[in-house]
Amino acid sequence: MRRMIITLLACLLMTSLMAPALCEPMSGTISEEDTAIVDDFIANFQLLAAVPRPSKHETSVSNVLKGWAEQLGCDVIQNEANDLFFDVPATEGYESLPLVALQTHLDMVCVAEDGHDFNPLTDPIDVIVDRDAGTLTADGTTLGADDGAGVAIVMSIVKGHMAHGPLRIIFTTDEEIDMSGALAVTAEDMTDVKYLVNIDSEASDTVTVSSAADAIVVTTGSPMLTDATKDTAVTIAISGLKGGHSGMMIGEGRCNGIVALAGILNGISEARPFELVSLSGGIADNAIPTKAQAVIQIDAADRATLERWVTDGAEALREAFAGVEDGLTLTVSDAAPAQRVFVSEQANHILAYATDSINGVYTMSEVIDGLVESSSNLGQIHVSADGIEIRQKPRSSSPERLAEMEDQYRTLASENGLMIDIAEGSRPWPANADSRLVPEIQRIYREQNGSEIKVEAIHAGLECGVFYELANGLDMVSIGPDVINAHSPGETLNLASIPKIWHLLEQLLIRLGN
């Protein structure tokens, strides 16, 4: 049985073998001069953290920021998507500079640790400020530095804490699901904008100049149920996984809880048939699932054997993800028996789709060493008597590779009797060889830090792709402070990187046009 499980989990090993070194610990010191910058940033961030703002539920935070900006004398436009737009006049002496848009998004991915009581629709984020470590984290949940950090930095700029030319502030919504906020921006909203600085990147030593496209794959089916014939119901659950952003961290070899559990169930099914009651896991399409659970029904006599098989499966997974997923846990517990269960053929089809789908790294770039070109993440699964829904997010910097993956999903769904809908997600953002922003940022960074800033393309979607499509030729970059483990409860922001980004912007916003 153990050999069978290891074979079924081979696809998971493929990703782990491609894993680069994990993120380094936070570092850096904050000077007395920069303490005021950090203090104001923290105050802004805590204001945001007090307002629940999961994707698709940004009305409250949009209203709060609208009122905040209006109190500062800004004339704010709020569209139907709850995006916010307002202009900030230039500091005296800088009125002749070109109009620069500063753009961030208001929503966040809300994920809680196992056992942590958290309702993302009603509960604030409990921010932990550790001055000694120089970090912001959250108590038991994601922090929301993606992209609360960008919003908080912009808030400090709007307050007048640095000199600048004319600015247009753009706060968008729903970036984390389908970028519907950015897609609601019109050409009129971008009138006269010469440059756009997106503050949604997660490394202060890097300027991002290109990003990948993605798609939203939703696979569904109508439950086919039959009367249960087995008398013992159990819940098999996987938990304790790292999770994280499915673009930025997909190459780190982290375990996908849904795919791993489906692999375990497949192995059990081949050895001893069971009846599937439900299968669920994941909280966002673009977050690697940290946990998943299935309720199955078995013969009472098979209970001890099942627990042994699950133990073998856990051991196989720990071997596959050694050094990466040290907190991985698989458990078996009693569940309430169901009267109706999935017919075995459909249950097998669901598990086959989950395990046979592309998950993790698909191709690596042949141009940029170490860059993932194409990948996919099985982000959510909800299988019960009420319905079947499986959500995936493929990404690629190659339109051909993205189309190739989409074709594979369609074929696999058809083979397993499922329906599929594929929608366009983020747009590709190609690098601009004629950019003025990039060389200016390189010069400023070199002057301020005595080293070269990294110029990178990323394997993730940024709203810059939407703005590129809307205003072809717009000169754009993406920058941001140091954030690790975004989209996971371990999300951490390096406070020393806030002044670093601040001083970069401080010079950039007065040099453009000179």
What does each model-found stretch correspond to?
Residues 26, 30-134:
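Acidic/His- and Gly-rich active-site-bordering loop/insert found
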Residues 165-257, 265, 269:
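Fold-level recognition of mixed alpha/beta catalytic cores in primary-metabolism enzymes, strongest
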Residues 210, 227-231, 250-280, 300-375:
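Acidic-enriched catalytic cores of C-N bond-cleaving enzymes acting on peptides and small amides
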Residues 94-194, 230-233, 364-365, 370-372, ...:
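Active-site metal-coordination/substrate-binding segment of hydrolases
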Residues 33, 37, 41, 366-389, ...:
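Zn-dependent metallopeptidase/amidohydrolase metal-coordination segment
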Residues 188, 254-271, 300-303, 348-357, ...:
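His/Asp/Glu-rich mid-to-C-terminal helical/loop segments that flank catalytic regions of hydrolases
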Residues 1-30, 245:
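Gram-positive cell-envelope targeting signals
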Residues 46-50, 293-295, 329-341, 377-381, ...:
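A short beta-alpha structural unit
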